[in-house]
Regions:
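Sec-dependent bacterial lipoprotein signal peptides
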Residues: 1-19
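Short solvent-exposed beta->alpha transition segments
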Residues: 42, 61-97, 104
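Hydrophobic pocket/interface hotspot
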Residues: 48, 56-61, 68, 79, ...
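Solvent-exposed loop/turn segments at secondary-structure junctions
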Residues: 67-69, 117-119, 156
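Surface-exposed, charged secondary-structure patches
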Residues: 85-128
């Protein structure tokens, strides 16, 4: 076994031993605990964007609150069905977005997302191609230390 491989295995073993001894990482990951609420919300919105483009329903829904309810009357179950349908009906989803504008008031926040979306349908007879630009308002609440989406819809 090469010296490099032995060094790598030794380092991994020491890391694992440190974790087993304390039950936690031996050192804090730099920056993680110091993220501002605005950065955490921006991360949530970015992860939803990545989930939409990758067509991963559960990556998107991981950030949606069970208390979700939008102006169209969709609750969590309905938004889950809607997102699932979009993922199945379209072969590719490409989203361009600007940095969101975020306002925080205690345990609640709102963000304006400016975006452009292009999506190609699997069956154009059933679903039209999407070429949409605009802005949406996203409302979030802090729950258990994390920010979750409770509504998104048109600007008011």
């Amino acid at each position: 076994m090469s010296k490099v491989m032995l060094l790598a295995l030794g380092t991994l073993w020491l890391f694992a031993a440190g974790c087993a001894r304390n039950g936690v990482l031996p050192a804090a990951i730099p920056g993680l605990e110091r993220m501002t609420d605005e950065q955490k919300i921006a991360y949530v919105l970015e992860d939803v964007w990545r989930g939409m483009e990758a067509r991963r329903v559960y990556q998107v829904l991981a950030h949606v609150s069970p208390r979700y309810l939008d102006q169209e009357g969709r609750d969590y179950t309905a938004i889950q069905e809607h997102v699932s349908y979009i993922m199945k009906a379209y072969t590719s989803i490409k989203i361009t977005r600007m940095r969101p504008k975020i306002w925080i008031a205690g345990e609640r926040a709102r963000a304006v997302e400016t975006f452009g979306t292009i999506a190609a349908p699997r069956d154009e007879r059933k679903d039209p191609p999407i070429n949409l630009q605009g802005q949406v308002m996203v409302y979030l609440e802090r729950a258990g230390g994390t920010w979750q989406i409770v509504e998104w819809g048109p600007l008011q």
